[in-house]
Design a protein with these regions (language model features):
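Phosphate-binding loop of NTP-binding sites
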Residues: 1-109, 118-124, 183
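Acidic, Mg2+-coordinating active-site environments of NTP-dependent enzymes
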Residues: 70-219, 245
C-alpha cells in the first residue's frame, strides 16, 4: 500500500494546478490517519490517504475518518494472518474502503483477481475502474526491463503513451496502473499521469535498488526490508530472478503470519 500511495502522490504533484497532500511514512493507523488529516488545508484540492490495518474492523473506522471519494483496493495477500486468519478476510477488510464511498464515488480494483467479483459486488452502482497487465480499464503493454527501469506502454482512456518506471519488480507496474486509475478518477490527463509516474522514486525499504562498484565488479542491491508476508516475499524473489546471475537472496523473519508461520518459513 505504501508504494502505491507514494506513486499516487507523485502523480498528483504532476498537476500543479490542483494542490495536493499525502500520507507521509507509515502514518496509516488510528493515530496516523487523523494526524495526516490534520495537515489538510483549504488550498488542497486532492489528497491521498493510506489506510492500514492488522485487525478486523480497522479499515471501516479509518475510512469513516477519511471520507474517500475514490477508493482503491490494490490486492489481498496473506498478510496479518495472525489476526485476520484468511486471505478472504483481508479482501473483505480492505473492501471497507469501497463500502465507505458515496454514491458518486469511484471504486478502483484489479481487473482479474480472485476477489474481483467480491469488490465489484460491493461497489454496487458506483463507478468502477479496473487495472491489469492486458485487461481492465488501465493496462500495460510492451513491458521490458531496460537500464534499471521498466519501459512499457500505458493504455487508458483510448490513449497509449510510453512510460518509464524507476523501481524494480514487475508487480510495481500493477501499482503504477492502480495509481493511474485513481488519477484518472480524479480528473487528471494521461500525459500528466505519465510525468508523475516517471518522477516517482522508490520508498526506502520497498524495492529500492542501488548500484555498487566493489573491486571492479558491479553489484545491484534491491532493498525490500520494510515489511514482509509470504506473497510479498514471493514478489521479492521474482525481482531477484529478473536480475542477471550470480544472485544472492537474504531473508529475515516474517511477522504476524499466525499458526502457519512454520509452513510459510519452510
Amino acid at each position: 500500500k505504501t508504494t502505491v500511495t507514494q506513486m499516487i502522490a507523485a502523480v498528483l504533484r504532476a498537476d500543479a494546478s490542483q494542490p495536493s497532500m499525502s500520507t507521509q511514512g507509515n502514518l496509516n493507523n488510528e493515530i496516523g490517519v487523523p494526524l495526516t488529516l490534520f495537515n489538510l488545508r483549504a488550498s488542497h484540492r486532492r489528497a491521498v490517504i493510506e489506510l492500514g490495518m492488522n485487525h478486523p474492523g480497522e479499515i471501516e473506522v479509518l475510512a469513516r475518518y477519511a471520507q474517500p471519494t475514490i477508493g482503491l483496493v490494490n490486492n489481498a495477500q496473506r498478510e496479518h494472518q495472525e489476526f485476520m486468519a484468511t486471505v478472504e478476510a483481508v479482501a473483505r477488510e480492505n473492501a471497507e474502503v469501497i463500502r465507505a464511498l458515496p454514491a458518486h464515488g469511484v471504486a478502483v480494483f484489479p481487473a482479474f483477481d480472485a476477489y474481483t467479483p467480491l469488490w465489484r459486488e460491493l461497489a454496487g452502482k458506483r463507478q468502477t475502474l479496473t487495472f491489469g497487465f492486458e485487461a481492465g480499464d488501465v493496462q500495460a503493454h510492451e513491458i521490458a526491463w531496460t537500464d534499471g527501469a521498466w519501459q512499457f506502454t500505458l493504455v487508458a482512456s483510448a490513449q497509449a503513451l510510453p512510460c518509464r518506471l524507476n523501481i524494480a519488480g514487475r508487480h510495481n507496474i500493477l501499482n503504477a496502473l492502480a495509481a493511474t486509475a485513481c488519477a484518472l478518477a480524479a480528473g487528471m490527463k494521461l500525459a500528466d499521469i505519465v510525468k508523475g509516474l516517471e518522477s516517482f522514486e522508490p520508498v526506502k525499504g520497498r524495492s529500492k535498488s542501488c548500484q555498487w562498484q566493489i573491486s571492479g565488479h558491479a553489484y545491484t542491491l534491491v532493498d525490500d526490508t520494510y515489511n514482509a508476508n509470504p506473497d510479498s516475499v514471493r514478489a521479492a524473489i521474482d525481482v531477484l530472478a529478473e536480475l542477471p546471475a550470480p544472485r544472492l537472496l537474504v531473508l529475515g523473519d516474517m511477522g504476524e503470519v499466525g499458526q502457519q508461520g512454520a509452513e510459510f518459513h519452510a
